[in-house]
């Protein structure tokens, strides 16, 4: 037992919470830009958009489109991203220790992401998480995706865990909105990807944590239970 006092089930977002996937997405975007004769985009320009989804990433890659992204461009992004998947991504510092501590406490953890399920399922084996994660819900696994509460409600129900015994950790406002709508407690992962005008203090999360290691503090979980 780790003695940290985790709830029965800790659910996580993937990109920007457990996984720093920005390098793979940057490689994808710059392949798209190179094909159009555009200069490479620096990581710092793209990083804030990583948690916003494939449409937002495609729009960020080509600001001149003013957000008017054709479905074909989104498909191109997803196809190229599948080729780049896992080449440069890595868990955020401290994630491996965190997941091990949850397991040592006798609790379970799972992933609820808006990333398409077929992509998420390719990532997990490369990290050794496919046999450890209790559940994986992708953005297209169900009729609704975050910020709708259904993915979180479904994950808890599938694992037979009461909502009151779950906590969701995410780095985007839609993560916190989904948890609140589901009646689930939430933690804002401040190490994730955010736009300059995002204000996590006003998202309504039950706790804000600056670093993964903050999730190893017993006092945090005591306050959430």
Q: What is each PLM-predicted segment?
A:
Residues 94-98, 151-154:
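Well-ordered alpha-helical segments embedded in enzymatic catalytic cores
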Residues 17, 52-54, 95, 111, ...:
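Gly/Ser/Thr-rich helix-start
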Residues 39, 108, 185:
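Residue-level detector of anion-binding/catalytic polar loops
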Residues 18, 86-87, 108-109, 140, ...:
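A generic structural signal for short
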Residues 1-8, 44, 103, 117, ...:
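Asp-based, Mg2+/Mn2+-dependent phosphohydrolase catalytic module
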Residues 3-97, 103-105, 118, 126-130:
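N-terminal helical cap/lid subdomain that shapes the substrate entry/recognition surface
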């Amino acid at each position: 037992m780790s003695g940290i006092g985790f709830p029965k089930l800790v659910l996580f977002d993937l990109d920007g919470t457990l996984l720093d996937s920005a390098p793979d997405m940057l490689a994808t975007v710059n392949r798209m830009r190179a094909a159009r004769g555009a200069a490479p985009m620096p990581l710092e320009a793209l990083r804030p958009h990583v948690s916003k989804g494939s449409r937002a990433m495609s729009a960020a890659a080509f600001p001149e489109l003013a957000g008017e992204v054709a479905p074909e461009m989104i498909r191109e992004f997803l196809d190229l991203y599948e080729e780049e998947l896992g080449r440069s991504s890595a868990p955020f510092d401290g994630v491996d220790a965190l997941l091990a501590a949850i397991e040592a406490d006798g609790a379970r953890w799972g992933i609820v992401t808006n990333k398409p399920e077929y992509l998420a399922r390719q990532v997990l084996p490369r990290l050794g998480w496919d046999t450890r994660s209790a559940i994986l819900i992708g953005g297209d696994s169900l009729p609704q995706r975050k910020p709708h509460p259904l993915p979180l409600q479904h994950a808890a129900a599938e694992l037979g865990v009461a909502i009151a015994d779950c906590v969701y950790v995410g780095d985007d406002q839609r993560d916190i909105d989904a948890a609140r709508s589901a009646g689930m407690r939430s933690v804002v992962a401040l190490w994730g990807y955010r736009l300059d005008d995002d204000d996590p203090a006003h998202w309504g999360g039950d706790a804000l944590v600056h670093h993964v290691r903050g999730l190893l503090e017993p006092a945090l979980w005591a306050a959430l239970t």
